[in-house]
Amino acid sequence: MASNTSFLFATIAILLVLNISGRTLPETEDSTNIAARLNGGGLMECWNALYELKSCTNEIVLFFLNGETKLGVDCCQAVEVITTDCWPAMLTSLGFTSDETNVLRGFCQSPNSGGSSPAPSSVKL
């Protein structure tokens, strides 16, 4: 009985080894090169937009408090990149409400954005 069990175990082990060694793995040229991954676009673009958003935080606060302050082009581009190309809920995780995020996104996507129209006053802090 012990020889049957060990034969069965050995057969299953050999079949598993043959199955694993026989499959092809996908090519991963750039996955080991961290510089290529970081310069590839997406991740760095999100970090740059987040850094730009940090520099225009005062502008965004005044945008909501005064209702007449205009957002700059760079600030709107950062909001656009973060909400469309990165994680859409990132602004919410940074402390903005979903209503404030929608107002910012709507203002920056409007044709008159970038400092040429007054801010909407629908969101109150």
Swiss-Prot record:
Asked whether the UniProt record includes Acetylation among its keywords, one would answer no
Which tissues carry this protein? Answer: Restricted to female reproductive tissues, specifically accumulating in storage vesicles of the unfertilized egg cell.
Top-rank taxon of the source lineage equals Eukaryota
InterPro entries per record: EC11-15 (IPR044711), Prolamin-like (IPR008502)
From the UniProt record, give one GO term of the biological process aspect.
regulation of double fertilization forming a zygote and endosperm
Name the Pfam families for this protein: Prolamin_like
Q: Where is the signal peptide?
A: 1-22
Any single GO CC term annotated in Swiss-Prot or TrEMBL for this entry: vesicle
Entry keywords, A to Z: Cytoplasmic vesicle, Fertilization, Secreted, Signal
Q: Where in the cell is it found?
A: Cytoplasmic vesicle; Secreted
Similarity remark: Belongs to the plant egg cell-secreted peptide family.
PANTHER family found in the cross-reference section: EGG CELL-SECRETED PROTEIN 1.2-RELATED, EGG CELL-SECRETED PROTEIN 1.5
Q: What does this protein do?
A: Involved in the regulation of gamete interactions during the double fertilization and to prevent multiple-pollen tube attraction; mediates the redistribution of the gamete fusogen HAP2/GCS1 to the cell surface after secretion upon sperm arrival.
Give the protein's recorded name.
Egg cell-secreted protein 1.2
Task: Name its species.
Answer: Arabidopsis thaliana (Mouse-ear cress)
